């Protein structure tokens, strides 16, 4: 059946034949009218119906291109006659700045690909699109649709207009005049109503253009978006939080001594202070490179700066070097910004003026900070503590005590950790005058009154991480207004709308900052080499803050042997060369903003920097898809944790008030601020520990689940934040209280949320290694529970770039214990969200603590325990799988199986994690043996060393030892090599008492704690006594005689031989298994090949039989036809001869009448003629059938193989 119909299109006397699918013509109706505008996108069916209504195209076609069609316009063009792309709008261009960036795709109608689409985006307003469609069979007729699709808030109203990020086009349209901007923006916003912050329903495009001209002077281009949501059109005082992902704070690309700009937005425009004199020449200038200053700039201000010098200060009155402070106070932005409805808590009426402080340290003799650990790309890729400010990571604490005291609750603005990754990647941070940080520190201070802190309460100061130096006071102004302001690296909730500061708006100031520095300050910032290559393109150009997105980067990369890496704002991640010119990497986690992206090699940077974007998620509404589900919002999750604990505490208070169970223990300390920095987990742990002794309650009612919890339990939230100590404490609570259904519902490692994600899935997706290992050791079944998309935790960890976490869990999964860990069995889980029974309660290990490091906290008697590493200095390599064990000794491996499981040497060389308990007391099982699998590799290496150190005379086969000990010692005095190579044995024997053993400590024949362990020199002296003449007379009987050395050598050979045989046996077994697999696969291959061959032969035979049969039929029909034809010819000949033959002689008497004779002949003739005609018709019909059969046989048959 023909599936395509031909349609002729008459086009100015040209007839064009178009083949369209018949199904398409049948299912789509013809449109009598083309709408001139539509404020929504057309469906594929509507587009196709417009394009197949060929008879109306002459009426609908536009003969000339329209200049700047308004929003919603639908126009039909003929691309051969009209250049429709020249419409007067400025569209987004590619990185070369020449060609327009277009997105192409094919569209389906009723499952058939018949449409082609080409999309472009406006360079001024990114929500304004031009979409062009045409039929694949008729590409000349193009349907063009212009539409502005604004981002919608949760309330359903349109968010404020958003402008594009930094690009080459932005520099062009910012140079336009007011009339040109009006001409561009007016048609874009046709038919759109915006909600404003002061409650008005409409806005004026003229106000918008005026605001653009005011906030973006015609100077160097600003580097971030001009967020127009920061004020109202009138005098409205409603506070506002812009939830648009286009409003960003730039994370600067700076060196350790370069400028670090952290902008703290504000909700209201500040009042302009008077203009002060310019910068004094005697003030020391900050050093920066052009690249760092340009990439750390933000949107500028329309007014000049207030510049005031401040006297240098030092701690304790001493002046060991000056600290010059430069205060740059920015002026207000214009009012009239458009604001949607605020969703967060309002704040008091502020009186702001924003100041930018440049602190230039000039102390060259400050003590250096402790060096940072060795750089590891996987550590930066996966660790939540470097370059990532959510998930419980350690942020940068402010260096000013006044600011610490005034630090107000704000988790969204808490990050500001641009110093953290740069210090980790480039070396130790510089020290300040009094031992704190030294260097150029840019920050923005909001000089608000202290009334803002009334609604929140003063929060306790957040302790700095252990490696950070003590803070030093540095007053910013003579009036000391810091104490009344907000924290320097944070602000109150909702204070996020102040337009960021732009250094690029002030070229004179930048020129002074880039000029020569004071001679006492070195300049470690490397200058870019002019030979750096250029990144031609990279995709995608943005990621969410959790990272893990695959990024492809194109450029002149051709060396396969080069070790490439990609640097995202000083966070280096490994990159692989997919093909010549294309690099692949996975972006790390980072805070929201624009960051620099650079390709580096072994020697240093290989390319110039480009801008990569981290976009914030919109968490005010629930994620609608599984792909957006495993994401994180600090503030919301921490609030959920506190709300859950508050519900449980209320429940306990109700039961205590009803007199069911007396409430025990002290009241929980109030947690005043929701989600401050590193101390939040510690405060929540204290709160949970205070609830444990008074939690002996049982109730039939369950906790109320609110909608923000997304079906996540308390353990889900703790795992998502990476709170390992909180998970530990919750497991201890679960082990104490085993009969509570409410607690089981909240603390169950097999519980799932709305998208079937377990707590382990959350920890793996967000890269929290310690939390993931704790949850895995708690219940291994969680590793095999997929989410609603069928993804397992390990696959999610791999796909998000958390490679080290996935390897650690795979290693733990391979080390399946032969004995079950001593976990106390809890009752089967009856949680409604989980259909699995869970064995999820760990028993209290000895002293009731669920310590992470109890198996590795043992130390020799009399020696202090190893100092724990601070959490900020621990690398991923330090966190071996065994270190994160929950105190349960692993099952012993076989002797020879160790080499496959541990290739990095004994675990005793790894540093220990800090103990999980707050009081720092070591558990009772601290002296328990370490992992048993250390012994095999030591025994093998010991045997090897013994064989190498044994003298050659001992190794001979004809060895005969002398009976006298003295003689044997005299013979061995020349064996200097033995004493030189036996030092390893001394260190081994020194630690052999602490190596694990398969017998319990109670079965040992002596008390371990009562015997003093000999030191290494003692062992060396004992072992070297057999090769030197020292102490021969006293210790002759204690040294190793020749026979003993021979026995030791034979034992070492036996061990080595057994190990080699075992390795050979394992290799032989593997080869036999491989051979069996190959044979089985080959047999199956041969069997399948024979089956396929037989099938092909059968198919050929069938086709041959069909061909023979058809040929025989045609041959038989042809033969019958020829016989019939010959018979007809004979009949005709006989009839003709019969007609010519003369009649019989005339008989008078017996003759018939002439009339009767004529009628008889006529009847005979008629019968013969009828027979002949019938035969001819039959022959003609058979000839037609034969011809049709021959035509069918002549056609190529697709199924036949020749």
Swiss-Prot record:
Compositionally biased spans, kind Low complexity: 289-299, 313-322, 826-846, 906-917
Start and end residues of each IPT/TIG domain: 537-615
Protein task: Transcription activator. May act as tumor suppressor.
Family classification: Belongs to the CAMTA family.
Motif stretch (Nuclear localization signal): 79-86
Residue stretches making up the IQ domain: 1049-1078, 1102-1131
Pro residues bias (residue ranges): 270-283, 365-374, 460-476
PANTHER family: CALMODULIN-BINDING TRANSCRIPTION ACTIVATOR 2, CALMODULIN-BINDING TRANSCRIPTION ACTIVATOR CAMTA
UniProt KW keywords: Activator, ANK repeat, Nucleus, Repeat, Transcription, Transcription regulation
Protein name according to UniProt: Calmodulin-binding transcription activator 2
Region (Disordered): 263-322, 361-409, 421-491, 817-874, 906-929
Expressing tissues: Detected in brain. Expressed at constant levels throughout the cell cycle in neuroblastoma cell lines.
Gene3D superfamilies reported in the protein's UniProt record: 1.20.5.190, Ankyrin repeat-containing domain, Immunoglobulins
Cellular compartment(s): Nucleus
Keyword Thylakoid attributed: no
A Gene Ontology term for the protein's cellular component: chromatin
Gene Ontology BP term (one): cardiac muscle hypertrophy in response to stress
DNA-binding region: 30-155
Native source species: Homo sapiens (Human)
Subunit structure: May interact with calmodulin.
ANK repeat boundaries on the chain: 712-745, 757-787, 791-821
Any one GO molecular-function label of the UniProt entry: double-stranded DNA binding
Gene for this chain: CAMTA2
